[in-house]
Amino acid sequence: MKSDNTRPTFNKPRRYTRLIFQQGRPPIDADFNEAHEIQLQMLRSYAADLIGDQGAVGGAFEITPERGAEEGGTHPVKDLTIGTGRYYVDGMQCENGADAVKLSTQPFGGPTADDLLQKPITVPALVYLDVWEHHRTWIEDDVLRDPALGGSDTGTRSRTVWEVRLLSKDKWTADEKKNFAKKGFAWKEALESRDGANHGKLRVRFNAGAHGGGDCDVDADARYRGVENQLYRVEIHRAGMALPSSADPDDPKDPDKKKFLDERAHAATFKWSRENGSVAARWVKARDCDPADGTVLRIEGPRDEVHGFSAGDWIEITEEVDDLRRHGWYFCADQTRRGRCAYA
């Protein structure tokens, strides 16, 4: 969740049951957030123990094929209708509150009608429900800003979202193709094994530099010289090569750096933030820019100079629809001083 927090402290193996505030101690966001996480974990565990790892209320999320006109002696599946109601996955409640929701019109993602026209549903296919939490800030929901505080935002929100997904047979493994018709085939485990690549670990180290001053002295070459708490966030977009630790990034003649630049088509794509990715602003249409120039971006002004965007910074451009549909992200360099990025 890309919110401005000090740190996440909830740890399920510790089995804490509540948080106890003490007199004379400063309240911090990490304590409040952990208290909510403890109660949420207990509630979902309770629901999973009673219901099981999955279960529906009535015909909730029942899948009904929508077939088209006969073609070659068969009626191809054009779309899928998703039943109304509540469904539980590992204790997480997801709700479809609308009638006649289809695979192509579900609220939180999925293929569009054009996608299904270009690539029709082939039978057999695996249809499954994916459920996760989606973080929202005032940028996605302006109601989260408090008018009494001059429009400042306070807490962010998290909501449960869902998506009915299709896995066509041509994407199944050999074992899945062989055993899919067997009763009790472990589809859940098969799907979870596909996400193994997303559960990697990151090893980081701190470069103290050559500065030999006292604990209160700050290296003049340090990029960050503040004293406030920092929660670093790193996101890997594409796996690949990284600049070797032996290379000098500031030396254009460094052989390791030169080799890396020569092969950067295979380089990893990632981003990092000292503020847990919470430095964000709305991007809006530039009315006063040349319509023929598609490289000019207009964004709302940052909340302050420290947490704003500086010339030379890389900016990620995305929107909520892309996030939910897991589409690609776009990056551009903030070249404000050269007129390529303007503030509204």
What function would you assign to each model-found segment?
Residues 1-344:
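Subunit-assembly interface segments of extracellular/virion macromolecular structures
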